[in-house]
Amino acid sequence: PDCSNMCHESSGFALSDSIGIGKGTVKLEDFNSASLILVVGQNPGTNHPRMLTALRDAKKHGASIISINPLIETGMKKFKHPQNPLEMLGSGKSISDRHVRININGDMAFFRGLNHCIVKNHNYDLNFIGEHTSGFEDYKASIESVDWDQIESISGISRQEIESIAEIVSESKSIITCWAMGITQHHNSVETIQEMVNTHLLGGHIGRKGAGLCPVRGHSNVQGDRTVGINHIANPSLIQNIQNS
């Protein structure tokens, strides 16, 4: 094992299976074009402090930010940029517009309920789905009926709040979802991440400016590792091409 598979191995499997590439789909500049940013199972102030600057700048450009996390992190409530004297003298800038205090590993149930609401209210991009996805009818049938008692119990979030957030998601023109160890370190992490991906695929929030998926890495050059094929289980085609060369 190395830094490329200790943390986001589940992200790599989930994304490769769902969208054909095992890494994020956004650039840093996309944050300034997003209308909604979901920060799920991640504590930027503690583990990715420089990301707070990107989130603050995104808010300046009009983005709404929803934090979905059992922990209410101070950095998401107030942020003072250490290189800005005026901010250091002030009370700080609010980062998160809304905090959803979910149960530990309640994310799958939460996004399942969220996607149910989106499908039920027909708030999906049928053109994008038809051109860029497969299996929609089967997925739609599987999610048209959900057990709300179970979703509320597992997620710790009320049906009313999930429906409220689904409405925000449906009204947003471009969405970025970020996640880290709070998502990836569970036995069902792959399924949870794929349900998050489904939220993006339903609305066409991928492959365009200001929208996409952002697994937030922690170690240096993990993204680069995967780009050049470094893995503890090497891709056979990579090995063959190296041998051929």
Task: Give the residues covered by each predicted segment.
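Flexible, surface-exposed loop regions and adjacent strand-edge segments
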Residues: 230-234
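Cofactor-pocket helix-loop regions in the catalytic cores of large enzyme subunits
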Residues: 1-220, 228, 242-245
